[in-house]
UniProtKB/Swiss-Prot annotation:
Pfam families: Cytochrom_B_C (PF00032), Cytochrome_B (PF00033)
Keyword annotations from UniProtKB, A to Z: Electron transport, Heme, Iron, Membrane, Metal-binding, Mitochondrion, Mitochondrion inner membrane, Respiratory chain, Transmembrane, Transmembrane helix, Transport, Ubiquinone
Record-linked PANTHER family: CYTOCHROME B (PTHR19271:SF16)
Organism: Akodon cursor
Binding site for heme b b566: 97, 196
Protein's recorded name: Cytochrome b
Binding partners and assembly: The cytochrome bc1 complex contains 11 subunits: 3 respiratory subunits (MT-CYB, CYC1 and UQCRFS1), 2 core proteins (UQCRC1 and UQCRC2) and 6 low-molecular weight proteins (UQCRH/QCR6, UQCRB/QCR7, UQCRQ/QCR8, UQCR10/QCR9, UQCR11/QCR10 and a cleavage product of UQCRFS1). This cytochrome bc1 complex then forms a dimer.
Length: 379
């Protein structure tokens, strides 16, 4: 068996990626979230496949087909809530994964990092089009508001959002194409995830100390396969508690009402995992400026490798940047809270301050703290 896995053309790839892969001996549980994201993706694809068997992408029957899945299909309620809450678990793992990458300086592996940003954007797009499919009030109005932002793009904006809508409003054509996008995008994510792994295995994993670990590596199996299995078990435990005890806690009550173009909800907001970006969008009074800030709130992650001037890898021995990092995390939580609040004083002012702080920390404070720490080393 050992000879087979080392010589067989297909098994050799698996062997080099998951069995004999040399891995730093000191990587902590923060490195588990990559495998948890893989698990989340598998859960989403499988549950999504079964949901697609019963769902109809037509404005007249979409809402009732979701109700039919929950009421009449065997374990349909379980599949639907696994899919809906699985998306939340996916984003929790994604945010922690990116946060760990920033804290431990994984952005120096620039190819892996940039593919990760593409994965992040693709996952956000998938979640957005998926949120529209149940065709509830918040689904419809969320789709209308967010796609309408494309009209802010100079020259081509008007044509672009009419093309995405498939008409002059969000209607049957929009729902049909969003369903098609939602079906195909997870497979594109899976392909990008393989490329992400390919680039990671070219350079080898980072580790918590930020030091070179070539002299102290162990095989991935059985050490980290066991560790990953424990992480997957804990993820499934949390997901099942969420699904079986609090299935609607992360949803929006407005989505229990069928979509009605003549009745606008009091407060249109996306799912919780988009609220930080939505708060940044709303904090700028100009439409085009808001859209640019929204896009930059994610694309600014690509600036980390470019702005990194530190002589040390990661934040483990950098107390000044550690403080700034945790302020950044707190600021993100404030943005998430503001995104779910109505557009009125004092929430608008807090949102504007938090948005400025978000960009200032990445562009100004972290590079300045890098310079300060580099000078401290020289003392």
């Amino acid at each position: 068996m050992k000879i087979l896995r080392k010589n067989h053309p297909l098994l050799k790839i698996v062997n080099h990626s998951f069995i004999d892969l040399p891995t730093p001996s000191n990587i902590s549980s923060w490195w588990n979230f990559g495998s948890l994201l893989g698990m989340c993706l598998i859960i989403q694809i499988l549950t999504g496949l079964f949901l697609a068997m019963h769902y109809t992408s037509d404005t007249t029957t979409a809402f009732s087909s979701v109700a039919h899945i929950c009421r009449d299909v065997n374990y349909g309620w379980l599949i639907r809530y696994l899919h809906a809450n699985g998306a939340s678990m996916f984003f929790i793992c994604l945010f922690i994964h990116v946060g760990r990458g920033i804290y431990y300086g994984s952005y120096v592996l620039s190819e892996t990092w940039n593919i990760g940003i593409i994965l992040f954007l693709t996952t956000m797009a998938t979640a957005f089009v998926g949120y529209v499919l149940p065709w509830g009030q918040m689904s419809f109005w969320g789709a209308t508001v967010i796609t309408n932002l494309l009209s802010a793009i100079p020259y081509i904006g008007g044509t672009l959002f009419e093309w995405i809508w498939g008409g002059f409003s969000v209607d049957k054509a929009t729902l049909a194409r969003f369903f098609a996008f939602h079906f195909i995008l997870p497979f594109i994510i899976a392909a990008f995830a393989l490329v992400h792994l390919l680039f990671l295995h070219e350079t080898g994993s980072n580790n918590p100390s930020g030091l070179n670990s070539d002299s102290d590596k162990i095989p991935f199996h059985p050490y980290y396969t066991t560790k990953d299995l424990l992480g997957i078990f804990l993820l499934l435990l949390v997901l099942m508690i969420l699904v079986l005890f609090f299935p609607d806690i992360l949803g929006d009550p407005d989505n229990f009402t069928p979509a009605n173009p003549l009745n606008t909800p009091a407060h249109i907001k996306p799912e919780w995992y988009f609220l930080f970006a939505y708060a940044i969008l709303r904090s700028i009074p100009n439409k085009l400026g808001g859209v640019l800030a929204l896009v930059l709130s994610i694309l600014i992650l690509a600036a980390f490798p470019l702005l990194n001037t530190s002589k040390q890898h990661g934040l483990i021995f950098r107390p000044v940047t550690q403080v700034i990092y945790w302020i950044f995390i707190a600021n993100l939580l404030v943005l998430t809270w503001i995104g779910g609040q109505p557009v009125e004083y004092p929430f608008t002012t807090i949102g504007q301050i938090a948005s400025i702080t978000y960009f200032a920390i990445i562009i100004i404070l972290i590079p300045v703290s890098n310079t300060i720490e580099n000078n401290i080393i020289k003392l």
